[in-house]
Amino acid sequence: MGVRKRISAEKRKESRRTMYFARLRHIPVSARKVRLVADMIRGIEVFKALGILRFSNKKISLFLEKLLKLAISNWEQKTGRQAENGELFITMVNVDVSTILKRIRPAPQGRAHRVRKRFSHVVIFVNTKNEIQN
């Protein structure tokens, strides 16, 4: 490994230590539907967001609730502190398109129509309010 590559890898590794996130990949829900719920919780305190997700009637809210709990536990594990009410906030929610599974459905007159089953990736970043402002 070259010197410049090693230095940039060390910088990336160091910046990842101060980021607290959780990633969920290949969710069987389209990214468009995920963004509807992700927009509801972006920038909100984590325990309030858990309440919003718990009482949402969307399928994706179950996945996002588990993912948010995982992000909170990652923050607790990296910092060594317990998350208190009003301390931890969702800084960023990234929703990306994943693979598309293509199926064929029979159609009239011997034809076939494509059915596209869409998947998505979600990353949730959490941090304390005073670290967000710095």
UniProtKB/Swiss-Prot annotation:
One of its GO terms (cellular component) is cytosolic large ribosomal subunit. The keyword Thylakoid does not apply. One of its GO terms (molecular function) is structural constituent of ribosome. Keywords: Ribonucleoprotein, Ribosomal protein, RNA-binding, rRNA-binding. GO terms for biological process: translation. Gene3D superfamilies: Ribosomal protein L22/L17 (3.90.470.10). Transmembrane segments: none annotated. This protein binds specifically to 23S rRNA; its binding is stimulated by other ribosomal proteins, e.g. L4, L17, and L20. It is important during the early stages of 50S assembly. It makes multiple contacts with different domains of the 23S rRNA in the assembled 50S subunit and ribosome. Part of the 50S ribosomal subunit. HAMAP family: Ribosomal_uL22_B. Belongs to the universal ribosomal protein uL22 family. This is Large ribosomal subunit protein uL22. The gene is rplV.
